[in-house]
Regions:
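Bacterial N-terminal signal peptides that target proteins for export
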Residues: 1-9
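N-terminal signal peptide c-region/cleavage motif recognized by signal peptidases
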Residues: 17-19
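Acidic, polar low-complexity linker/tail segments
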Residues: 26-34
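A post-motif C-terminal structural segment
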Residues: 35-38, 43-130, 135-137, 178, ...
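RNA-binding basic/glycine-rich loop and surface signature characteristic of RAMP-family CRISPR effectors
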Residues: 143
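Glycine-rich phosphate/pyrophosphate-binding loops
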Residues: 162-164, 168-187
């Protein structure tokens, strides 16, 4: 089987070379002007099946998401430089992605973490995965590094990242997330740290960062996971010093906290001064970690749990950010993360993965609507991707049928899913892009994975790039 896949890969390479313009790629010697407005959407930890299960639940079919109509569709590999958790002092890559091994359907005995391998490809995909810090660093800086690094390379040097480059170009900047803003992915767009776990120091760095005009996310020290006031502060994600600095007239940022204020921002009814921190009144996730015993039931939602009433949606936050950044004369760069998709994928919680992915999809729709209303695709770029897979969700028979897709049970019904892992996976992920500069991603896609076509139906030629390639297109150096 591996030999057949390698033969198919060779054929696909010839096909891709012949059809270099299959997705409308511009000639390599025609540099595109950078987009005025750049929006990067990251559904953290979204394996192929994650995108599909949310579409099946919400729409009963694939093809109805805002990014499904985008002009550029690519694969994106996510492996780190190495799997060390500390810098090893060199630039040698020790891990890679091999399509032939990733899609190998040879039956395989054995197990990892109590889960059977089933097939050689599954076993391969469970190994050598990136963490969110290294993945986000590659997306933000263009440099592969060790797991755990926030804009630090494997030699221990601090790296320039996307919001710094955007600010140097005169653009406004924003970072939004459904998890604490000091967590790995948002941190990589506003901080530099040898370790992702230094949440308090990262929060202080981000809040004082002149390259960040707007920050929105969770991590509120005074509220718990269900949005209830705490008896004493929890400063895990926002340090006591950072929180103290936000109080009073000398605060480094305008502070927005209530759902009502986030909704007023989204409607343009509130115009606070930048820089701004939108700190949602919840501790770790917007909604993903809520307890049904506290919030009550809502059978109309996938999980059956009502939502926390005082918490805005990621889509509302996105609209609010666009109200504040969208009128800046030189444009803006904005990163929006559906971070809790990853948290729920670690738990293999199908219903809550779907809820989080749906909220993420609605945030993308808000940005597309903004482009149609306030801008145009000749000056705006939207990229939708994940930083890595997580959980390897496939169809219910995928223990017998290799790579069986998620099974559609119709709109409003949980799809058929079998999870094969409880952590990150080394898979070729899915990317969509549209607007000014999207064609440059095609030019950066120098490898081919035939299964993007044959198994996933994602694009027409299997073209694939790396996460570091995306960074080089995202915000060019001024």
């Amino acid at each position: 089987m591996a030999a057949l896949i390698r033969a198919a890969m060779a054929a696909a390479l010839v096909f891709a070379a012949t059809l270099a313009g299959a997705q409308g790629a511009a000639p390599p010697d025609t540099p595109a002007a950078p987009a005025k407005h750049v929006m990067l959407f990251i559904s953290d930890g979204a394996s192929w099946g994650t995108w599909h299960m949310a579409s099946y639940y919400e729409h009963g079919a694939l093809g109805h998401q805002p990014y499904d109509a985008f002009s550029v569709k690519l694969g994106m590999t996510t492996v780190p430089l190495n799997t060390s958790s500390v810098p090893t002092g060199n630039t040698t890559r020790t891990v890679s992605y091999d399509p032939a091994r990733a899609w190998d359907t040879t039956p395989l005995a054995g197990q990892l973490g109590g889960r059977p391998h089933h097939f050689a490809g599954y076993e391969y995909l469970r190994r050598d995965a990136t963490d969110s810090a290294a993945a986000a660093t590659a997306l933000a800086s263009g440099t592969k590094t060790y797991n755990g690094a926030i804009n630090h390379d494997n030699l221990g040097r601090a790296l320039t990242y996307a919001t710094q480059r955007a600010k140097a170009r005169g653009q406004a900047t924003g970072v939004l997330t459904s998890v604490p803003f000091s967590h790995a992915t948002p941190a990589a767009f506003g901080a530099q740290s040898a370790s992702r776990n230094s949440y308090g120091a990262i929060s202080e760095q981000m809040l004082a960062n002149p390259a960040l005009d707007l920050i929105m996310g969770a991590g509120h020290p005074l509220f718990d996971a269900d949005g209830r006031p705490r008896s004493s502060p929890d400063h895990r994600y926002v340090s006591a010093a950072a929180w103290a600095a936000l109080q009073g007239p000398a605060s480094p940022r305008t502070l927005v906290q209530t759902r009502a204020d986030f909704e007023a921002l989204a409607l343009g009814q509130l115009q606070p001064r930048l820089p701004l921190l939108g700190l949602v009144q919840v501790h770790d996730t917007l909604q993903a970690n809520r307890n049904v015993a506290v919030v009550g039931a809502n059978p109309g939602l996938p999980s059956g749990a009502a939502t926390i009433p005082g918490v805005p949606t990621l889509a509302t936050m996105t609209r609010g950010a666009l109200q504040l950044l969208g009128h800046q004369p030189k444009g803006f760069f904005m990163m929006v993360e559906g971070g809790a998709v990853d948290w729920m994928a670690h738990a293999n919680n199908t219903a809550r993965v779907i809820e989080e992915q749906m909220d993420f999809n609605h945030a993308v729709q808000a940005a597309v609507d903004w482009v149609h209303t306030h801008s145009h695709w000749g000056e705006s770029l939207i990229i939708v991707l994940t930083d890595h897979g997580n959980g390897m969700p496939m169809g219910p028979g995928s223990d017998r049928v290799p790579f069986e897709p998620i099974r559609n049970h119709g709109q409003g019904v949980l799809p058929g899913v079998r999870w094969h892992h409880g952590s990150h996976s080394n898979e070729n992920t899915l990317l969509w892009a549209h607007g000014q500069g999207a064609q440059q991603l095609l030019q950066a896609a120098q490898t081919v994975d035939p299964a993007l076509v044959s198994r996933l139906g994602h694009n027409r030629d299997g073209r694939t790039l790396t996460n570091a390639d995306v960074a080089r297109v995202l915000v060019p150096a001024p």
